């Protein structure tokens, strides 16, 4: 049996019907979601890593022994991806780096008139967190587009979270971008951990 899509004639729809068509399920549940996210953030603040392991078990149905991805797994990721993917990542890396390098204007001093100077000081954010969603396809381009500017800016610590299990393509992009702090955590709990810190993050 074939599924036939409903044809909607917008001009013939009532205001209420249009509103219903345009509404998203997530928006209709926004208060419920907001309260759940607040609870998750509160638990991550209070219980740290324990909350992360618990939420990974509940939401991702995975019982992790370690939320941190080992350096060995990151380094060996190239063994588990195709030559075509490696080539595509290398080309994308060079292009993205070339573009963002032009944005790095740096600090400067400017004499605007006698005894009056203006200065621009550029300082990188010391520690940053990147979140890479997990879906039907690995979003390794997101790793490149977030990590390359952070590296160019001179951020000293770059952490990355992605829901478990993290795909080898993502780990390979982490390797190329020299990201060493990679964690198997997804959702609001990952954002809370990056923002508030835990024993591991």
Curated annotation (Swiss-Prot):
GO terms for molecular function: histidinol dehydrogenase activity; metal ion binding; NAD binding. It comes from the Bacteria. Its EC number is 1.1.1.23. The keyword ATP-binding does not apply. Its cofactor is Zn(2+). The keyword Amino-acid biosynthesis applies. Pathway: Amino-acid biosynthesis; L-histidine biosynthesis; L-histidine from 5-phospho-alpha-D-ribose 1-diphosphate: step 9/9. It catalyses: L-histidinol + 2 NAD(+) + H2O = L-histidine + 2 NADH + 3 H(+). GO terms for biological process: L-histidine biosynthetic process. One of its GO terms (cellular component) is cytosol. Pfam families: Histidinol_dh. Keywords: Amino-acid biosynthesis, Histidine biosynthesis, Metal-binding, NAD, Oxidoreductase, Zinc. Catalyzes the sequential NAD-dependent oxidations of L-histidinol to L-histidinaldehyde and then to L-histidine. Homodimer. Belongs to the histidinol dehydrogenase family. This is Histidinol dehydrogenase. It comes from Buchnera aphidicola subsp. Schlechtendalia chinensis. The gene is hisD.
């Amino acid at each position: 049996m074939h599924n036939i899509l409903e044809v909607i004639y917008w001009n013939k729809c009532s205001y209420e019907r249009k509103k219903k068509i345009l509404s998203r399920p997530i928006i209709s549940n926004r208060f419920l979601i907001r309260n759940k996210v607040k609870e998750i953030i509160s638990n991550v603040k209070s219980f740290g890593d324990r909350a992360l392991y618990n939420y990974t078990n509940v939401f991702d149905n995975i019982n992790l022994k370690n939320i941190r991805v080992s350096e060995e797994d990151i380094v060996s990721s190239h063994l588990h991806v195709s030559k075509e993917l490696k080539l595509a990542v290398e080309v994308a890396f060079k292009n993205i780096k070339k573009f963002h390098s032009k944005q790095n204007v740096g600090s400067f001093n400017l004499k605007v008139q006698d005894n009056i100077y203006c200065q621009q000081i550029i300082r990188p954010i010391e520690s940053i967190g990147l979140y890479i969603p997990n879906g039907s396809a690995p979003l390794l381009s997101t790793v490149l587009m977030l990590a390359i500017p952070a590296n160019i800016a001179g951020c000293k610590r770059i952490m990355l979270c992605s829901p478990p299990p993290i795909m080898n393509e993502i780990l390979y992009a982490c390797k190329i971008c020299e990201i060493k702090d990679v964690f198997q955590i997804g959702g609001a709990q990952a954002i809370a951990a990056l923002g508030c810190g835990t024993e591991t993050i």
